[in-house]
Regions:
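S-adenosyl-L-methionine-dependent methyltransferase catalytic core, i.e., the SAM/SAH-binding region
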Residues: 1-144
Length: 144
């Protein structure tokens, strides 16, 4: 018997730094969203992904985003609302050449406008993920 997640290539949750007991909210799911990425994340955190209607505080937001999905700044502002101060938003976009591809500049320009900064990116099969966080100075000001 092969353990789940060890038989089919990369562990996407590990690449994204998602681990047990983290609360992950998924935004922007559609038919083209990668079920392997979703399954790896659910297995790693030990629970199902929260949907868009959840009002829980979350550690990670997984935001599926395509070039025709609207205003990324507005969507990022919505994604920040449930995010813990040290939480992470992963903007997951189709990789270059795939339908719905988003230019990296769009994410780089939208993040600071939404009060976020991009720290890294990761390749996830046919998708590319950009890691966005709230600047430490902002988070530090909220700590007690």
């Amino acid at each position: 018997v092969v353990a789940a997640g060890t038989d089919s290539g990369p562990n996407y949750a590990h690449i994204l730094g998602i681990h047990k007991d983290q609360i992950v909210q998924e935004l922007g799911w559609d038919e083209d969203s990668d079920d392997d990425i979703r399954a790896d994340i659910e297995e790693a955190c030990g629970s199902e992904l929260l949907d868009e209607d959840s009002d829980e505080v979350v550690d990670v937001v997984l935001l599926w985003w395509r070039d025709d999905d609207g205003d990324l700044v507005d969507r990022l502002m919505d994604a920040i609302t449930p995010l813990a101060e040290d939480g992470v938003i992963w903007v997951v976009t189709p990789k270059t050449g795939k339908p719905g591809h988003v230019l990296p500049a769009e994410i780089a320009e939208s993040a600071p406008t939404a009060g976020l900064m991009q720290t890294s990116s990761a390749k996830l099969g046919d998708w590319t993920a950009s890691r966005l966080v709230q600047p430490k100075s902002k988070a530090a000001g909220k700590r007690t």
